[in-house]
């Protein structure tokens, strides 16, 4: 009977969280975002859930450090930038006037294009009266698909020297949406609350905000909460390394009516496993219990 009951719980959970898009974010780096992302993905896969992990911290992706996998596919990512063709240009300066990002400067004798500032909006190219600014692809990074033991792992990685993460994140999400339609999608977002985080979160069904019970943790959590509310995103909070600080985060969440999904206690053994690049839930029981609480919570709010 016990095995049957457990099976019923597992089937119910599969029905409730299948096809969900979950973003795991934080107001700052180092709170445990990637630790939760990698362990939650692997744990779901061990329960026969169809799941894919996508590392969207494209400037410094590190989920691969904790996942044993083999490369299955790779794809070059480009963004479109204008290239000045001088032959027909009348140097009217209209291109520089319409660019909101100062990516184009009109000089008396030439047009300068700064690709690192270009947002690929096509305004300069479309409004040029002599068609002297055709758009051309410029490589910005690569998407790599890996196969782990029982789940797929996608990594977006921005090339060195590239300054705009949003196009890379957008194309990585598109790759996942196209190739992994019928499964749970877990997005490991960049840290912070700027444009890359918004791009990683805005189409998700639910966001998990990772924080810690310290003054810095609370400050950055408030910024992350404000961001999610602007996006009108459903979200909950996980307090990681619970026990190292005070109760200010809990008081804040209570006052703001923010659900605390689970509290993961501070544990030296967790830190040791992390430093070795190992998954934690197979060896730390209380950590696995926290993952169960996450799965149960998401199933409840989606049910």
Go through each PLM region and give its residues.
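Short beta-strand-centered segment that lines the nucleotide-binding/catalytic pocket of NTP-utilizing
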Residues: 49-63, 137-141
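Walker A (P-loop) phosphate-binding motif
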Residues: 16-45
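Ferredoxin-like iron-sulfur electron-transfer modules
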Residues: 40-44, 68-91, 102-120, 150
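Flexible beta-alpha connector loops of hexameric P-loop NTPases
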Residues: 157-164
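Conserved catalytic-core segment of NTP-binding enzymes
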Residues: 130, 137-142, 167-263, 272
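Hydrophobic alpha-helical segments and helix pairs
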Residues: 117-151, 155
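Iron-sulfur cluster-binding cysteine motifs and their immediate structural context
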Residues: 94-112, 123-139
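C-terminal lobe/tail of nucleotide-utilizing enzymes
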Residues: 2-4, 9-16, 225-303
């Amino acid at each position: 009977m016990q095995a049957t009951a457990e099976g019923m719980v597992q089937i119910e959970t599969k029905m409730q969280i299948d096809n969900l898009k979950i973003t795991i974010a934080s107001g700052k780096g180092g709170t445990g975002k990637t630790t939760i992302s990698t362990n939650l993905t692997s744990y779901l896969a061990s329960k026969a859930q169809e799941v894919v992990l996508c590392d969207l911290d494209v400037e410094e992706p590190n989920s691969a450090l904790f996942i044993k996998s083999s490369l299955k596919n790779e794809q070059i990512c480009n963004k479109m930038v204008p290239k000045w063709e001088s032959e027909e240009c009348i140097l009217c300066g209209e291109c520089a006037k319409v660019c909101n990002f100062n990516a184009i400067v009109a000089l008396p004798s030439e047009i300068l294009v700064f690709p690192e500032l270009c947002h690929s909006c096509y305004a300069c190219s479309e409004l040029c009266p002599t068609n002297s600014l055709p758009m051309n692809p410029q490589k910005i990074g690569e998407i790599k698909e890996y196969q782990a033991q029982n789940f797929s792992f996608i990594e977006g990685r921005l090339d060195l020297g590239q300054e705009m993460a949003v196009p890379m994140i957008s194309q990585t999400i598109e790759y996942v949406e196209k190739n992994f339609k019928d499964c749970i999608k877990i997005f490991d977002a960049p840290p912070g609350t700027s444009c890359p985080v918004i791009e990683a979160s805005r189409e998700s069904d639910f966001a998990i905000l990772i924080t810690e019970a310290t003054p810095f943790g609370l400050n950055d959590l408030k910024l992350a909460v404000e961001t999610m509310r602007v996006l009108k995103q459903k979200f909950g909070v996980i307090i990681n390394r619970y026990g190292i600080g005070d109760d200010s985060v809990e008081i804040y969440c209570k006052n703001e009516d923010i659900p605390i999904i689970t509290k993961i206690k501070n544990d030296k053994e967790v830190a040791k496993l992390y430093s070795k690049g190992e998954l934690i839930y197979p060896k730390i029981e209380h950590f696995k219990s926290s993952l169960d609480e996450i799965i149960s919570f998401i199933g409840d709010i989606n049910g």
